[in-house]
Amino acid sequence: MLWQKSTAPEQAPAPPRPYQGVRVKEPVKELLRRKRGHTSVGAAGPPTAVVLPHQPLATYSTVGPSCLDMEVSASTVTEEGTLCAGWLSQPAPATLQPLAPWTPYTEYVSHEAVSCPYSTDMYVQPVCPSYTVVGPSSVLTYASPPLITNVTPRSTATPAVGPQLEGPEHQAPLTYFPWPQPLSTLPTSSLQYQPPAPTLSGPQFVQLPISIPEPVLQDMDDPRRAISSLTIDKLLLEEEESNTYELNHTLSVEGF
């Protein structure tokens, strides 16, 4: 059998362009949408076939008689269904037993049956300015029965003298612990205290006479007093005597 290449081959298609992506305004939302779409399609429908690009094959024309035209005896040809059945031996269909219902677990406790302590009403009780108790009514200290049972009412005969103290707005109840032994039955102290020393009758401080000498006024020669006591005549005479002395001294020097 001879094969002859056709003289007019078909024109080969252009190679596909590479995927360059798609411009979208919000890429994150687009990716999430595509991912959800792929997961829904993959879960619902059959897997899609992937087609890869391939080069086209050259076509050839037959010249001689084809070998497929030969007569084949009908006895040798078997049906496809019987041939496949002969290849694989199918097992006999087994009888299916009905599934028994599941037995419930004895120790299983329903979540709804469990009473959560925090699902009930919560109460807040301030204990002090920086501490507050939060919990159900069974946890908090204020309950229907009073906690302080042995409190006597205050007598109105003796009014309080001191100023009233302003307590906090929400004061927590105080628990009173009774003293088992009364104060009258307490034993007296065995220690004997010495009495204090008697005070001295006499004066404790001795007064000593101190004599302070008076300052003696000394008569000092004050030049101002001497000048004030002299008269003007005496002053003029003293000046003249001093002048004559100076003149006599100068004349004696020049005559020498």
Swiss-Prot record:
Keywords: Activator, Nucleus, Transcription, Transcription regulation, Ubl conjugation. Residues 1-24 are annotated as: Disordered. GO terms for biological process: cellular response to virus; germinal center B cell differentiation; positive regulation of interleukin-6 production; positive regulation of transcription by RNA polymerase II. The keyword Nucleus applies. GO terms for cellular component: RNA polymerase II transcription regulator complex. B-cell specific. It comes from the Eukaryota. Disruption phenotype: Mutants show severely reduced or absent germinal center B cells in the lung-draining lymphatic nodes when infected by influenza virus. InterPro entries: OCA, PD-C2-AF1. One of its GO terms (molecular function) is transcription coactivator activity. Pfam families: PD-C2-AF1. Induction: In B cells, expression is highly increased upon activation by LPS or CpG. Interacts with POU2F1/OCT1 and POU2F2/OCT2; the interaction increases POU2F1 and POU2F2 transactivation activity. Transcriptional coactivator that specifically associates with either POU2F1/OCT1 or POU2F2/OCT2. It boosts the POU2F1/OCT1 mediated promoter activity and to a lesser extent, that of POU2F2/OCT2. It recognizes the POU domains of POU2F1/OCT1 and POU2F2/OCT2. It is essential for the response of B-cells to antigens and required for the formation of germinal centers. Regulates IL6 expression in B cells as POU2F2/OCT2 coactivator. Belongs to the POU2AF family. In the N-terminus possesses a conserved domain OCA for bivalent binding to class II POU domain-containing transcription factors and to an octamer DNA motif. This is POU domain class 2-associating factor 1. It comes from Mus musculus (Mouse).
